């Protein structure tokens, strides 16, 4: 109905288009060889695809079988050198002008200090709680006082054998101490210290006085006894007057 109304109406004017030659002269329509139209998909008749200009670029074929080993080495060198250049860009920028002066003998110590982690190794930090640990050996930088010896942990078998020996002999000779240390895989000093501690415990259990304390305390008492005895002897000696009587 609408199309018929346009045709019936006498005022309808058909649009006029310029000839194709003017399009070629004004550059609106390029040469037909520069354009190509892709085939339309018959499944989608309502969607028209736009035309794209053809590319005049021709890809050159390359023969990979004729690649020389020098080219491969150059490529690998450039590939490995790229991460190093990236890391250098992120680091501090140091120019050679800062090291080289007018006479060429300028000191570059300041430049080396700019990289604290590269040349100087960090010293281990020793905290106070680390100094209180019982250790056998300490480093030269240790300043926590005299190092303490580690306590010997005797096994159950070693403690049992030492108890048996202490039951028969509370004091060991040098020869017997060496034999026990050799059979129990201990040092002579460890056996000696164990017997000393065991004797102290035995005296404490039997409520016996300590010989070390008794010897130190008995020394001045003996001195007083000797002085009293000399005084009594002097009083008992006969005088010349009593002998004449």
Curated annotation (Swiss-Prot):
GO cellular-component term (any): nucleoplasm
Job of this protein: Sequence-specific transcription factor which is part of a developmental regulatory system that provides cells with specific positional identities on the anterior-posterior axis.
Compartment(s) of residence: Nucleus
Protein name: Homeobox protein Hox-A4a
Family the UniProt entry places it in: Belongs to the Antp homeobox family. Deformed subfamily.
Region (Disordered): 34-99, 205-245
DNA-binding region listed in the record: 147-206
Residue span of motif Antp-type hexapeptide: 126-131
Pfam families attached to this UniProt entry: Homeodomain (PF00046)
Basic and acidic residues bias locations: 35-51
InterPro entries: Antp_homeobox_Deformed_sf (IPR050609), HD (IPR001356), HD_metazoa (IPR020479), Homeobox_antennapedia (IPR017995), Homeobox_Antennapedia_CS (IPR001827), Homeobox_CS (IPR017970), Homeodomain-like_sf (IPR009057)
Any one of the GO BP annotations: positive regulation of transcription by RNA polymerase II
Record-annotated membrane-spanning stretches: none
Organism name: Danio rerio (Zebrafish)
SUPFAM superfamilies referenced in this protein's UniProt entry, alphabetically: Homeodomain-like
Gene name as annotated: hoxa4a
CDD domains the UniProt entry points to: homeodomain (cd00086)
Main location: nucleus
Listed Low complexity bias regions: 230-245
């Amino acid at each position: 109905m609408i199309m018929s109304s346009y045709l019936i109406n006498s005022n309808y004017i058909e649009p006029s288009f310029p000839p194709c030659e003017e399009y070629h002269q004004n550059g609106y329509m390029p040469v037909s060889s520069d354009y190509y139209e892709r085939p339309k998909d018959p499944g989608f008749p309502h969607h028209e695809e736009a035309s794209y200009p053809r590319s005049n670029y021709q890809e050159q074929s390359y023969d990979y079988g004729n690649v020389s080993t020098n080219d491969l080495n150059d490529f690998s060198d450039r590939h490995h050198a790229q991460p190093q250049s990236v890391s250098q860009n992120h680091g501090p920028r140091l120019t050679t002008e800062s090291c080289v002066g007018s006479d060429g003998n300028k000191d570059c110590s300041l430049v080396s200090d700019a990289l604290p982690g590269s040349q100087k190794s960090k010293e281990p930090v020793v905290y106070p709680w680390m100094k209180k640990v019982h250790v056998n050996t300490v480093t030269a930088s240790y300043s926590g006082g005299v190092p303490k010896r580690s306590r010997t942990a005797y096994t159950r078998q070693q403690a049992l054998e030492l108890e048996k020996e202490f039951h028969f002999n509370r004091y060991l000779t040098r020869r017997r101490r060496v034999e026990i240390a050799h059979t129990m895989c201990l040092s002579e000093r460890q056996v000696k210290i164990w017997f000393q501690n065991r004797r102290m415990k035995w005296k404490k259990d039997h409520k016996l006085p300590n010989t070390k304390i008794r010897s130190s305390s008995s020394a001045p008492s003996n001195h007083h006894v000797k002085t009293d005895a000399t005084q009594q002897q002097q009083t008992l000696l006969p005088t010349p007057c009593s002998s004449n009587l």
